[in-house]
A protein has these predicted regions:
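Tryptophan-anchored aromatic micro-motifs
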Residues: 24-52, 147-148
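Classical Sec-dependent N-terminal signal peptides that target proteins to the secretory pathway
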Residues: 1-26
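Edge beta-strand at a domain terminus
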Residues: 129-154
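N-terminal glycine/threonine-rich, aromatic-flanked beta-hairpin/loop signature
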Residues: 51-88, 124-131
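Short, hydrophobic/aromatic-rich segments at coil-to-beta transitions
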Residues: 26-35, 95-106, 123-126
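Hydrophobic/aromatic beta-strand elements that line small-molecule binding cavities or substrate pockets
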Residues: 113-120, 143-149
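Generic short beta-strand segments
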Residues: 35-44, 106, 127-132
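Contiguous, well-ordered beta-strand patches that form the walls/edges
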Residues: 71-118
Length: 154
């Protein structure tokens, strides 16, 4: 089941491009915290051509504090995934609904982008980092996590 979901999410992210820039569709106010376990990473660069590495082959860490907060109609805050995505002014795509949270940020000057999607039901998170966007030799890291919601303590 996770492999099927991973493939669907991966295809969705890979087909997702800057033509959707400025897309904002925040349908719900959310304030969620997750603890996410690294599952695998796919690397595409001059050394690896979409090679998959399992969590135990990587130095990458789990996400202990991944937080999402949205406020209708257009605010989305991300914390704990990457410093780049934590800068909410960089977000060009923000989608929040009952099923998924999807976001993308880009820096044209640095030729760099990051995007991610989390399935709110399954907890599957896919984070894509793209370097050298404008080049034929763009580089990608696609990281898969399995996340569980953290209960808020009152």
């Amino acid at each position: 089941m996770i492999k099927k979901n991973s493939l669907v999410l991966l295809l969705f992210l890979l087909s997702f491009n800057l033509s959707f820039a400025k897309d904002i569709n925040i349908q719900e106010n959310i304030d969620l915290s997750f603890k996410c376990k690294l599952v695998k990473k796919i690397i595409k660069n001059s050394e690896y051509n979409y090679q998959t590495f399992s969590a135990n082959e990587l130095d990458d860490k789990d996400l202990d504090q991944f937080k999402l907060k949205s406020i209708k109609p257009e605010k989305l805050f991300i914390n704990g995934l990457s410093l780049f995505l934590s800068k909410s002014e960089k977000l060009i795509v923000k989608v929040v609904n009952k099923d998924v949270v999807l976001f993308k940020a880009a820096d044209e000057e640095k030729d760099y982008s990051e995007s991610a999607i989390i399935n709110r039901k399954s907890g599957e998170l896919v984070h894509e980092i793209t370097r050298n966007i404008k080049s034929e030799n763009s580089e990608k890291d696609i990281v898969f996590y399995s996340c569980e919601k953290k209960e808020k303590k009152v």
